[in-house]
């Protein structure tokens, strides 16, 4: 078999799409405190956009509270400003180098918007998985055309690729269902 078709590579790329989806889901506000909520936020630190988790320790002491212990006292105001301007509706309370970030409950309309956004993220992941499937199928067709595979081998490998795709899409749908239930939970 040639290097052009590698089932492990296809599986790795599909898993990557699912992992990317999980990271996007972690950044969605559900009304429950989560360190992942702050991960997408970048702070202008010393002239460079820096991920917030590189500027302090993030912890979740209570279900509706995130604390952020900023290491450099000169960065506390910049971190506070970045969180307030992030668009996720959080208002930190400064206590020296510690920021307390209460998580307000979500109203029904906002929950529906976030659930819809989660659906969009899942659709992007499905498209990524289908693109990986297409790449695998194209490689198999090319190998058959070049004489590296018989028609029967190509069909068998195509079924394997389709099976991988179905499993990946099923995992995406399970993640989406779980996240939407979490979002809609009052």
From Swiss-Prot:
GO terms for cellular component: cytosol. It comes from the Bacteria. Its main location: cytoplasm. Keywords: Cytoplasm, Protein biosynthesis. InterPro entries: Ribosome_recyc_fac, Ribosome_recyc_fac_dom, RRF_sf. One of its GO terms (biological process) is cytoplasmic translational termination. Disulfide bonds: none annotated. SUPFAM superfamilies: Ribosome recycling factor, RRF. Pfam families: RRF. It is found in: Cytoplasm. GO terms for molecular function: ribosomal large subunit binding. The keyword Glycosyltransferase does not apply. The keyword Protein biosynthesis applies. Responsible for the release of ribosomes from messenger RNA at the termination of protein biosynthesis. May increase the efficiency of translation by recycling ribosomes from one round of translation to another. Belongs to the RRF family. This is Ribosome-recycling factor. It comes from Maricaulis maris (strain MCS10).
């Amino acid at each position: 078999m040639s290097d052009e078709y590698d089932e492990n590579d296809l599986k790795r790329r599909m898993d990557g799409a699912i992992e990317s989806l999980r990271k996007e889901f972690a950044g969605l506000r559900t009304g429950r405190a989560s360190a992942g909520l702050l991960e997408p936020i970048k702070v202008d630190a010393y002239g460079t956009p820096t991920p917030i988790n590189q500027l302090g320790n993030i912890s979740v002491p209570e279900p509706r509270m995130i604390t952020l212990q900023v290491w450099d006292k000169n960065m506390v105001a910049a971190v506070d400003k970045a969180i307030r301007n992030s668009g996720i509706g959080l208002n930190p309370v400064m206590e020296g180098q510690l920021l307390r970030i209460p998580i307000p409950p979500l109203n029904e309309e906002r929950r529906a918007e976030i659930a819809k956004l989660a659906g969009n993220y899942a659709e992007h992941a499905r498209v990524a998985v289908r693109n990986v499937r297409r790449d695998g199928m194209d490689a198999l067709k090319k190998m058959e055309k070049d004489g590296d595979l018989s028609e029967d081998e190509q069909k068998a490998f195509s079924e394997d690729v389709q099976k991988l795709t179905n499993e990946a899409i099923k995992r995406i749908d399970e993640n989406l269902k779980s996240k939407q239930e979490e979002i809609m939970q009052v």
